[in-house]
Amino acid sequence: MSSTKNVLITGNTINFYMPNRPKLKVKMHTQCFNNFKNNQKNSMFAIIFDVLVNKKIIQNSDVIIYIWPNSKLEALFQINYIISLLSKTQKIFFLGSNRSGIKCIQNLLKKWIIITKIDSSNHCILYSGIIVLKPIFLYENFIKFNKWNNIVVKTIPGVFSYNNIDHGTKLLMSTCTKNLRWKTVLDIGCGSGVLSTYLATIFPEIKLTLIDSNIAALESSKLTLTSNNVCGEIFPSNIYSNVHYQNFDLIISNPPLHVENKLNFSIIDNIIKNSVKYLSNKGEIRIVTLKNVPCHKSFTLYFKKYTILKTSSHYKVYQANYKDRV
């Protein structure tokens, strides 16, 4: 009998480091496209890019290590799925930083798993789990259904603005009126897909391209577009990394401000800086962000002028034209 153990690492694996262990056959699951691309050629483990891990991979794993995400609901969604497929001979461990929210694990999972704390070090905690009851996992029970302006919005746990449509997106949508003449749109960080779906209700002939680095967001966008009979090209991309078309009339985004709970303005700067490479001659970029974010610095660097189209108590919508590029 082979002594090689099949190990599956899943959950929030973006910053997880896997030391080389010859007697371990490791598979790592990620929802992050950048993480997937960076590790495709890693000889220490096979990388999987999907919303959830394939059933057979879970069932063939001797050990599962779940890295706790920042969203409690995302953890419940993924763990519910995993333990619904496990046998009692399989081992499952949970690892997370003190700041991730992992300390709620015993209350969150007590119906299905006996949780035991094994160790804590370097601001992280490690737990083991013994399954006492296998849940019946129903994917559709975790899809959040929202409705706004007759648009059906469907969102998977872990995707931005799961419970409702955020005010920034609403403000950005309010600047998009019927008198504008857009034929091609790039929606960066598409999330639930509500922004592109709204544009399709105003411009029925519009050609939509939706990108996100998170596969759960891409799946949410597919669900939203399908529910509203809207067509669009949806694919993973780390900002512009996977975008090949370079003639968009509009680049639109409600970009993330945090990476792993830390403020990070590099994404916004990248979107603004490189937008000119992907805009048509009459194209424009529109971005919504919090009022206190120094977005104007990037626009000043890369455009001769820009416009603040709209403001609210918390948000600003910025706009700049390709013709005004530096």
UniProtKB/Swiss-Prot annotation:
UniProt EC number: 2.1.1.172
Protein location: Cytoplasm
Cited InterPro entries: Mtase_sm_N, RsmC/RlmG, SAM-dependent_MTases_sf, Small_mtfrase_dom
Pfam families registered for this protein in UniProt: MTS, MTS_N
Signal peptide start and end residues: none
SUPFAM superfamilies named among the record's database cross-references: S-adenosyl-L-methionine-dependent methyltransferases
Catalyzed reaction equations: guanosine(1207) in 16S rRNA + S-adenosyl-L-methionine = N(2)-methylguanosine(1207) in 16S rRNA + S-adenosyl-L-homocysteine + H(+)
Residue ranges of coiled coil: none
One function term, GO molecular function aspect: 16S rRNA (guanine(1207)-N(2))-methyltransferase activity
Keywords recorded for this protein, A-Z: Cytoplasm, Methyltransferase, rRNA processing, S-adenosyl-L-methionine, Transferase
Keyword Methyltransferase among UniProt keywords: yes
CDD domains assigned: AdoMet_MTases (cd02440)
GO cellular component: cytoplasm
Entry superkingdom: Bacteria
PANTHER family: RIBOSOMAL RNA SMALL SUBUNIT METHYLTRANSFERASE C
Entry's family note: Belongs to the methyltransferase superfamily. RsmC family.
Job description of the protein: Specifically methylates the guanine in position 1207 of 16S rRNA in the 30S particle.
Oligomeric form and interacting partners: Monomer.
Protein name as annotated: Ribosomal RNA small subunit methyltransferase C
Organism annotation: Buchnera aphidicola subsp. Baizongia pistaciae (strain Bp)
